[in-house]
Amino acid sequence: MKANDFRKMAEAELKQKRDELTQELFNLKFQLNTGRLENTGKLGAIRKDIARINTILTESRG
């Protein structure tokens, strides 16, 4: 997702989305380590989305 899409979301929605992405990242890392993951680029995309959400949450606090 784009940062502007995340900025339109409420804080509670952002936290929920971050939790979902963190769980998905965990599952993908597990698949990577067991050799079942085919699309390794998805790992980086999810990590970047989590970072975007964390940045937006930090901006809203300040």
From Swiss-Prot:
GO biological process, one term: translation
Entry superkingdom: Bacteria
Listed GO CC annotations: cytosolic large ribosomal subunit
UniProt entry tagged with the keyword Secreted: no
InterPro entries: Ribosomal_protein_uL29 (IPR050063), Ribosomal_uL29 (IPR001854), Ribosomal_uL29_CS (IPR018254), Ribosomal_uL29_sf (IPR036049)
UniProt-listed PROSITE patterns: RIBOSOMAL_L29 (PS00579)
Cited SUPFAM superfamilies: Ribosomal protein L29 (L29p)
Pfam family, any one: Ribosomal_L29
The entry's keywords: Ribonucleoprotein, Ribosomal protein
MF-aspect GO terms: structural constituent of ribosome
Alphabetized HAMAP family for the sequence: Ribosomal_uL29 (MF_00374)
UniProt similarity note: Belongs to the universal ribosomal protein uL29 family.
Name this protein carries in UniProt: Large ribosomal subunit protein uL29
Protein's organism: Trichlorobacter lovleyi (strain ATCC BAA-1151 / DSM 17278 / SZ) (Geobacter lovleyi)
UniProt lineage: Bacteria, Pseudomonadati, Thermodesulfobacteriota, Desulfuromonadia, Geobacterales
Gene: rpmC
